[in-house]
């Protein structure tokens, strides 16, 4: 389990405010690795980077904080603090569903706000509310691009941020001025992450449970059938541990026809390989993002077709729900729209976008009451009682976050 990241930290904020550049400044790794993204320059699927935080035993704080093995200031070998997985969530408004499913994997978050634009931008607002709704408590604000604004604008931007975070989970968050492009104040940011975003206590003795955020076929077109690798799923363990050779179950699984009806069947397979932080492992635990090789037909896992599933020890996973009753907690205002619109009560018959763990599905409200509602899902979700879910409603051409529900 050594070499594995201990914690997932989300990078959230408006498009082009520098989330991916910040990852690069911290790690030397671009998270925009999917070809379609690099073309559009936007992180579409959740981008991941594992970063090792280290500390020089000789230098004073904050200069002692680094990601380099040899201190650039004094040449001393640095000491390992911990390995962290950064989840780079897309800042484009049409990709809010991906941001919400990523928030399910976050133990803490860094909200990136560019100093050269007025704060808040629409997605800055939407992402902060999403963190609030999903219940991510430990937040740090990075005021980025300070190298391209005047001192006056930097201070004005700081005041705008302070005003904007009032009454949210980031009200007391430290605000760190940074230039991701120049690498300025990255040491202070690492120090702040170490102080503010602690590794949560995890239960490794419970049955393994993993939220699946990606799934793919790693075979090249035209590969020899004898050498084909099985399908791969990627995501984060929230409890327990997985070992090579373990049997796993994946729910809700795949859609099959049974007696002329469409139904869902969970998948069972054996773990053939585990990868975390770019290294092969025999065993993985919670924290960080892991790739799990299986014996599944790669056609079942290609192009993220299993993302949103829950995987783990067979027979221990939450039930697959096609409908549920939820307690509803609505925000006062719709987030992300230009005009401030009041959130109307949920109505019978309306469709809602529902994020359950890493699943995004649409639920139609069968019956709505003052503080709870019954919904029927278009795509089933593997979810337990008491789980928090994000609720969005169609406003104009977009889904907008309106609050959260708790499954009853």
Swiss-Prot record:
Region of interest called G1, as start-end residue ranges on this chain: 13-20
Sites where the protein binds Zn(2+): 56, 59, 71, 74
Binding residues annotated for Mg(2+) 1, in chain numbering: 20, 43
UniProt superkingdom: Archaea
Gene Ontology CC annotations of this record: cytosol
Binding-site residues, Mg(2+) 2: 16, 41
Residue numbers spanned by region G4: 144-147
Subunit composition and interactions: Heterotrimer composed of an alpha, a beta and a gamma chain.
Protein name in the entry: Translation initiation factor 2 subunit gamma
Organism: Methanothermobacter thermautotrophicus (strain ATCC 29096 / DSM 1053 / JCM 10044 / NBRC 100330 / Delta H)
Organism ancestry: Archaea, Methanobacteriati, Methanobacteriota, Methanomada group, Methanobacteria
């Amino acid at each position: 389990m050594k070499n594995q990241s201990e914690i997932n930290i989300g990078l959230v904020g408006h498009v082009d405010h520098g989330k991916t550049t910040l990852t690069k400044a911290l790690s030397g790794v671009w998270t925009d690795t999917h070809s379609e993204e690099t073309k559009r320059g936007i992180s579409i699927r959740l981008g991941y980077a594992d970063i090792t935080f280290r500390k020089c035993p000789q230098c004073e704080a904050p200069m002692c904080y680094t990601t380099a093995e040899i201190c650039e200031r004094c040449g001393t070998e640095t000491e390992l603090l911990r390995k962290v997985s950064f989840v780079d969530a897309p800042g484009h408004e049409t990709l809010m569903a991906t941001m919400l499913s990523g928030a399910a994997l976050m133990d803490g978050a860094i909200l990136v706000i560019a100093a050269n634009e007025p704060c808040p931008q629409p997605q800055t607002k939407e992402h902060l509310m999403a963190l609030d709704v999903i219940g991510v408590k430990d937040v740090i604000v990075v005021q980025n691009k300070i190298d391209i604004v005047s001192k006056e604008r930097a201070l004005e931007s700081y005041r705008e941020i302070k005003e904007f975070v009032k009454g949210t989970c980031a009200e007391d968050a430290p605000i760190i001025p940074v230039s991701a492009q120049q690498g300025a104040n990255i040491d202070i940011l690492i120090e702040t992450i170490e102080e503010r975003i602690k590794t949560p206590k995890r239960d490794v003795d419970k049955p393994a449970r993993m939220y699946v955020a990606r799934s793919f076929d790693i075979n090249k077109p035209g590969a020899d059938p004898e050498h084909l690798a099985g399908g791969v799923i990627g995501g984060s363990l929230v409890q327990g541990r997985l070992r090579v050779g373990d049997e796993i179950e994946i729910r809700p699984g795949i859609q099959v026809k049974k007696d002329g009806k469409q139904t869902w069947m969970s998948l069972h397979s054996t773990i053939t390989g585990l990868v975390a932080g770019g290294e092969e492992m025999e065993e993985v635990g919670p924290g960080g993002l892991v790739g799990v090789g299986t014996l599944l037909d790669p056609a079942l896992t290609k192009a993220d077709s299993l993302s949103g599933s829950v995987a783990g020890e067979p027979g221990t996973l939450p039930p697959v729900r096609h409908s549920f009753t939820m307690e509803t907690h609505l925000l006062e205002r719709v987030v992300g729209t230009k005009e401030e619109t009041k959130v109307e009560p949920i109505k019978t018959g309306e469709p809602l976008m529902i994020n359950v763990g890493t699943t995004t599905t649409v639920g139609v409200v069968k019956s709505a009451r003052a503080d709870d509602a019954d919904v029927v899902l278009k795509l089933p979700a593997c979810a337990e009682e008491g789980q928090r879910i994000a609720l969005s409603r169609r406003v104009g051409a977009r889904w907008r976050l309106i609050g959260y529900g708790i499954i009853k």
